[in-house]
Swiss-Prot record:
Alphabetized CDD domains for the sequence: Peptidase_M54 (cd11375)
Cofactor note: Binds 2 Zn(2+) ions per subunit. One is catalytic, whereas the other seems to have a structural role.
One family name in Pfam for this protein: Peptidase_M54
Keyword field: Hydrolase, Metal-binding, Metalloprotease, Protease, Zinc
Annotated EC: 3.4.-.-
Classification lineage: Eukaryota, Metazoa, Chordata, Craniata, Vertebrata
Protein name: Archaemetzincin-2
Source species of the chain: Mus musculus (Mouse)
Top-rank taxon: Eukaryota
Residues at which Zn(2+) 1 binds: H254, H258, H264
Record-listed Zn(2+) 2 binding positions: C265, C270, C289, C292
Length: 359
């Protein structure tokens, strides 16, 4: 394992900038907000840790990228920020998200609430669900994993065409696996920053995807026609566990972060780190580092302690059931408890941040 540890000077410059105007902006922040963000360059911080690289297959090793500091983010003339006329994050579900209508609806509410807390100050709305056939996307059976996949480029085109006028962005979510081109095995998600659209799949976040017990396998023989979407009827949907909900929240906020102009983080352990595989994605924290937090705050304009309190409230609202998973059928509960036990460590982290902000 390799630990990527930057110097105090490097991290401080990445956060504050060398530009006197941006430094002055930073110095005008609330004292508590400065205290929290200054943790970025504290060697013994117990809130923000260095990035660890565990193998050559990790993102940083296999996808070399130039880092983006706050000044580069702020001065990016191609970056799009929310404005009064375009200030809503729209989420479009594609295909069923749960095994019943009730489960799908509750899952959507949980994701909406999380996004509203994470991007505190922006509105989040869900569009009416659409079927795979309505997108007219290409699809295939993955020759390695034998599961159905839909084409990201075609989905992005569909989303762009149906993007509401007041949308800052529109993101599609699905429980069906994705592929961007024939030569690729899969992709967790894909976004177009210039168009403000993205598509993300949670198919691989189920507990059985990488096991022999996975129930979503099909054969190429079942594909009667490249336009026969009936193969998606009653297609396997993973159970909404607490871990799947956490992974979904991570992916959704990571990708919307990209649409807001945040590139992959290479400063500290951060939600905005790139990930090549599920194990690496699971290592990423739910929180953004101080450098990326300043970027988000600059783009949206939230009060940090209010944002953290909103995230704690999302976790606390509706305690989860003991099993940490949604019921198998809608008849078990008319109103499903939110499975949040996987978020408990993060809640403790948020409370430590709030204490520091209010010190």
């Amino acid at each position: 394992m390799q630990v990527l540890r930057h110097s105090e000077h490097t991290l401080k410059t990445a956060l504050l900038s060398k530009n006197p105007v941006l430094v002055s902006q930073y110095e005008k922040l609330d004292a508590g907000e400065q205290r929290l963000m200054n943790e970025a360059f504290q060697p013994r911080s117990n809130l923000f840790e260095p990035i660890t690289v565990h193998s050559q297959s990790d993102w940083i090793s296999s996808h070399p990228e130039a880092p983006q500091d706050f000044e580069q983010f702020f001065s990016d003339r191609y970056r799009k920020a929310p404005c009064p006329k375009k200030h809503i994050i729209y989420i479009q579900s594609i295909g069923s998200l749960g095994n019943t209508r009730v489960i799908s609806e509750e899952y959507i509410k949980w994701l909406k609430g999380y996004c509203e807390a994470f991007f505190y100050g922006l509105k989040v709305k869900f569009l009416e669900p659409v079927s795979v056939s309505e997108t007219k996307c290409s699809f295939r059976v993955n020759e390695h994993t034998q599961n159905l996949q839909i084409h990201t480029g075609h989905i992005l085109a569909f989303l762009k065409k149906n993007k509401p006028e007041d949308a800052f962005c529109i993101v599609g979510i699905t429980m069906i696996d994705l592929y961007p081109r024939d030569s690729w095995n899969f992709v967790f998600g894909q976004a177009s920053l210039s168009s403000g659209v993205g598509i993300f799949s949670f198919a691989r976040y189920g507990k059985d995807f990488y096991t022999s017990k996975y129930e979503g396998n099909v054969t190429s023989l079942q594909l009667t026609s490249p336009t026969d979407y009936s193969i998606f009827d009653n297609y396997y949907i993973p159970e909404i566990t607490s871990v799947l909900l956490l992974r979904s929240c991570k992916t959704l906020t990571h990708e919307i972060g990209h649409i807001l102009g945040l590139r992959h983080c290479q400063w500290l352990a951060c939600l905005m780190q790139g990930s090549n595989h599920l194990e690496e994605s699971d290592r990423r924290p739910l929180n953004v580092c101080p450098i990326c937090l300043r970027k988000l705050q600059s783009a949206i304009g939230f009060n940090i302690v209010e944002r953290y309190r909103a995230l704690v409230k999302w976790i606390d609202d509706e305690s989860c059931n003991e099993s940490g998973a949604t019921p198998k059928s809608s008849s078990e509960h008319a109103h499903l408890p939110k499975p949040v036990e996987a978020f408990k460590d993060w809640r403790e982290w948020l409370m430590r941040c709030i204490a520091l902000l209010e010190k």
